[in-house]
Curated annotation (Swiss-Prot):
UniProt cross-references to Gene3D superfamilies, sorted A to Z: Complement Module, domain 1, Fibronectin, type II, collagen-binding
Gene Ontology terms describing biological process: acute-phase response; cell adhesion; regulation of cell shape
InterPro entries the UniProt entry points to: Fibronectin_type1 (IPR000083), FN_type2_dom (IPR000562), FN_type2_sf (IPR036943), Kringle-like (IPR013806)
Modification after translation: Forms covalent cross-links mediated by a transglutaminase, such as F13A or TGM2, between a glutamine and the epsilon-amino group of a lysine residue, forming homopolymers and heteropolymers (e.g. fibrinogen-fibronectin, collagen-fibronectin heteropolymers).
Positions of glycan attachment: N17, N115, N129
Species assigned in the record: Notophthalmus viridescens
Pfam families: fn1 (PF00039), fn2 (PF00040)
Fibronectin type-I domain segment(s): 55-98, 103-145, 146-190
Complexes and interactors: Dimers or multimers of alternatively spliced variants, connected by 2 disulfide bonds near the carboxyl ends.
Designated name of the protein: Fibronectin
């Protein structure tokens, strides 16, 4: 690439002198030119301006589309996008994630519609109730679920869970009650 340098005419390509832009050697018909006299020696080329009706965009699979055409493409991270061929002299695509078009949220690779609720484990281990708000940006919010955390082990327990605990050699059965304040109680086992 020539970093925006102007065309140099004539330029030599395939043992032939070109005095105008060509699409020779390109499957996508994009017109190009050499930006030095000898393309082989210098490996410098650039794309030529095209009329809007000539311009195309090419997918990774080699499929060609005219300016204005919309296609659905999969992003490298797996989510789907709606892409429009805008061209701009470079075969440029403008893509928008489905989550923005459909006002959805993508969380941990799972797509949720607006107002859908779901649970998610926080990186510290506690569970959260989450809601997809979308708002054109895939926005979502989570609040901690009423649960308990053992003050010694830092382990989280959901309401109704029970676990055994040893304190100074005595075995206890503990119960998660919650009540909005993380309440839990333990009783000695006989």
């Amino acid at each position: 690439n020539s970093n925006g340098a102007s065309c140099h005419f004539p330029f030599l390509y395939n043992n032939r002198n070109y005095t105008d832009c060509t699409s020779e050697g390109r499957r996508d018909s994009m017109k190009w030119c050499g930006t030095t006299l000898n393309l082989y020696a210098d490996q410098k080329f650039g794309f030529c301006p095209m009329a809007a009706h000539e311009e195309i965009c090419t997918t990774n699979e080699g499929v060609m589309y005219r300016v204005g055409v919309q296609v659905d493409k999969q992003h490298d991270q797996g989510h789907m996008m709606r892409c429009t061929c805008v061209g701009n002299g470079r075969g440029e695509w403008n893509c928008v994630a489905y989550s923005q078009l459909r006002d959805q949220c993508i969380v941990d690779g799972i797509t949720y519609d607006v107002n859908h609720t779901f649970t998610k484990r926080h990186e510290e281990g506690h569970m959260m109730n989450c809601t997809c708000y979308g708002q054109g940006r895939g926005w979502w919010k989570c609040d901690a679920i009423d649960q308990c955390q053992d003050s010694e082990t830092r382990q989280f327990y959901q309401i109704g869970d029970s676990w055994e605990k040893h304190v100074q050699g005595v075995r206890y059965q503990c119960y998660s009650i919650g009540r909005g304040i993380g309440e839990w109680h333990c009783q000695p086992l006989q």
